[in-house]
Amino acid sequence: MQTYFLTSDFPNGFPEAFITALKQTIVRQEHFVFAASSFDKAEVNEKYARKIMDMFAAAGFHFQTLTILDDRLPLAQIDQVLEQAGVIWLAGGDTLAQHASFERIGLREKLKKTTAVLIGMSAGAINMGDQIVLARHELDN
């Protein structure tokens, strides 16, 4: 059985209730996968992956490895990385860019096979769905 968390941003770190739920759910802390929202922005992805890892460390989680799923990860390695993951974090950010990248690599189908805890934040939570509705903001082009 898969476990999903759908979240918004955490500007003040993880709240205690979320930490408690994570501690009851996460059993494997070897491998953490951070699925970026903009696969082509390596520097930004590094920054936000580190921020999330720091919040996990502050909550008492210490993963042995971090893999950032973006354009730097060879397609041939994605299945193995997902199979080894204890937690897969789907980042917030550009919802449409993330959706396009997920479609390109077939990520949503791959996630259906994982035993990892899946956490979608903002755009990542939206992109976990099979049917995605994203209303355009009036200021969008």
Segments (PLM) and residue ranges:
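Generic detector of intrinsically disordered, low-complexity, polar/charged segments
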Residues: A57, W89-L90, V117, M121
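Class I SAM-dependent methyltransferase SAM-binding "motif I" and its flanking Rossmann-like core
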Residues: A97-N141
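Short glycine-rich anion-binding loops that position phosphate/pyrophosphate groups of nucleotides
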Residues: F10, S38, G93-T95, A123-G124
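N-terminal beta1-alpha1 cap of cysteine-dependent amidohydrolase-like domains
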Residues: M1-V87
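Short acidic, glycine-rich surface-loop motifs adjacent to enzyme active sites
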Residues: A85-H99
